[in-house]
A protein has these predicted regions:
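N-terminal post-signal-peptidase region of extra-cytosolic proteins
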Residues: 39-56, 62-65, 126
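Flexible, membrane-facing loop/turn or short amphipathic-helix motifs
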Residues: 38-42, 106-111, 133, 151
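Internal catalytic-core helix/loop-beta-alpha segment
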Residues: 121-127, 134
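Short N-terminal segments immediately surrounding and downstream of signal-peptide cleavage
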Residues: 21-40
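Generic short beta-strand segments
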Residues: 32-35, 64-67, 127-128, 147
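C-terminal interaction modules
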Residues: 1-23, 43-49, 72, 80, ...
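Short, small-residue-rich packing micro-motifs
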Residues: 59-122, 140-149
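Short, exposed beta-strand/loop patches in secreted or surface proteins that constitute
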Residues: 28, 50-52, 85
Length: 222
């Protein structure tokens, strides 16, 4: 009887193993604080590398804080400045601040990486997008590949590498305009100065793709 019970218990454990061992979102790197994590039902604590996260976790940084997160889907993003966001399944809900997100190159059957704001949702089809939201503006910039943007007011746009969608929010009426290609000099400036691209423990997976696509070089060669 004991042998049967033990075997049954092992069977239950093996059956449950896939869900128990499922990958959790994780804090990958925290180059600078202040950076904070608030797990569901818990108090806010300082973010630390290797920390496991869960659905509905709230992440926050204050200047000069920044950190890198890897989701259970394998998508990654970096956030910084006065940023605030929530993890919701495989979607990132950005309430304010700056974020750069990417899909690892070479993945087969990869699904889009979705980042939501109160004004629009950006869906990464290619590999890398930068989003910044504050009281004055919403900026969506495709570093590499295709990014689809759907606004809450019904507009739809598709950005290609080097294109930017910029919306001024300090106007009586929010007006959306088609994305525009930024100049090479501006792309170089952003790539070399960005605190979300440079200064982390390891370079972004898509950095070489960005450099090849835009013909510019970053400083980060960690």
């Amino acid at each position: 009887m004991r042998l049967i019970a033990t075997a049954a218990l092992v069977g239950v454990m093996l059956h449950a193993a896939p869900s128990v061992l499922a990958k959790q979102p994780t804090v990958v790197d925290v180059p600078n604080g202040p950076a904070f994590v608030k797990l569901p039902g818990r108090k806010e604590v300082n973010a630390r590398s290797g920390q496991d996260l869960f659905d509905n976790t709230v992440l926050r940084t204050s200047k000069p804080g920044r950190m890198q997160i890897k989701l259970s889907s394998g998508r990654q993003f970096r956030m910084g400045g006065n940023a605030l966001l929530q993890l919701k399944n495989s979607t990132v809900k950005l309430q304010r601040g700056a974020l750069i997100g990417w899909i690892q190159p070479g993945l087969k059957n990869r699904q889009p990486f979705t980042i939501q704001t109160r004004l629009a949702t950006a869906s990464i089809q290619g590999t890398t997008v930068f989003i910044e939201l504050d009281d004055d503006k919403l900026k969506v910039f495709s570093w590499e590949g295709e990014v689809k943007v759907a606004t809450t007011s019904g507009e739809s746009y598709t950005l290609q590498s080097g294109e930017q969608l910029l919306v001024e929010l300090n106007q009586p009426t929010i007006t959306w305009s088609p994305p525009v290609k930024i100049k090479e000099a501006e792309a170089t400036r952003r790539l070399t100065k960005s605190r979300l691209i440079n200064g982390f423990a390891t370079p972004m997976d898509t950095l070489q793709d960005i450099e090849r696509e835009l013909g510019v070089k970053a400083l980060d060669r960690s």
